[in-house]
Each structure stands twice: as C-alpha cells, then as structure tokens.
Amino acid sequence: KATGIAGIYYAVQMANFGLLSEAEYRAFGEPYDRRILAAVADCWFNMVHLHGRAGMFDLVAQYGVHALNWHDRESGPSLAEGVQRFGGAVSGGLEHWDDILRGDPDGLRRLVHEAVEHTGGRRLIVSSGCVAPVNAPFSNLRAIRQAVGEIVR
C-alpha cells in the first residue's frame, strides 16, 4: 500500500499517571495506539511523543517505534535513563518554555552538549520534550542547530 509518507509523529496524551492508571490505559488507550501504529509499521520512521509530566514511559517504550520523545527535562526518565530503557532513538534534551523560549543561545549550546554527553552521542535526536513555541527567538533555534552541527562534523 502506497501512503506517500515516511512515517508519523504520534502524540500520546492520556498515557499519563496523572490521568489514568496503567491498567486503565492498557484497557482503553493502548489498543487504539497499537492499531494506529500497526497501520504505519512499514514506514521508514515513526516517532511517539509521550505528553505530560507523569507519562507511562515503560509502557509506551514497548510500542516498537523508531524514536520516543517525552518531557525529559521536566520529568523522568532522564535522557541517560531513557536511552537505557528504550531501544530506539531518544528525542529531547531541551525544555520548550524555559530553554527554547526564555533561554539564551549560550545556555542552549551547553544543553545540547549535555544531551550528547548523557546519551554518549548515540541514538539521540536533539529536540524539546514537547512542542517548540512558535515565538521562540530565532537566535535560540539557530544556536541549537549550530551546536548540533559542531558536534556531528
């Protein structure tokens, strides 16, 4: 089946201990997540975003996607723990409000380097743990990109 897509970025908002127990999510959420992800399983790259500060990381880490993004700077696990508990790429290292919106270029460069250190530079996609604000200063976004470019040379 031709879809014309390379994959999806799938946001999971209810797999959150502040909203449901793990048993409740396994009954009422996980089956639907898995049906959606099964429909795109043959795509080249699928990523799940685990939304919220009390996400069910270990449950979602079993979804069989290529990358997992979560609020790593606001809640657990850390990137270092995440790369140990999830077999694919981890996506994070930056907090969307304090770092990307209100931070400064030098601080962001430092955080990019920390993310690389915490993961050993393997299986890492440097990103925010949630959406990047549309009003984030371009100088901050440029600093993030430049820091990544310096590392991957």
Question: Each predicted region: which residue ranges?
Answer:
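Active-site loop segments of alpha/beta catalytic cores
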Residues: 1-153
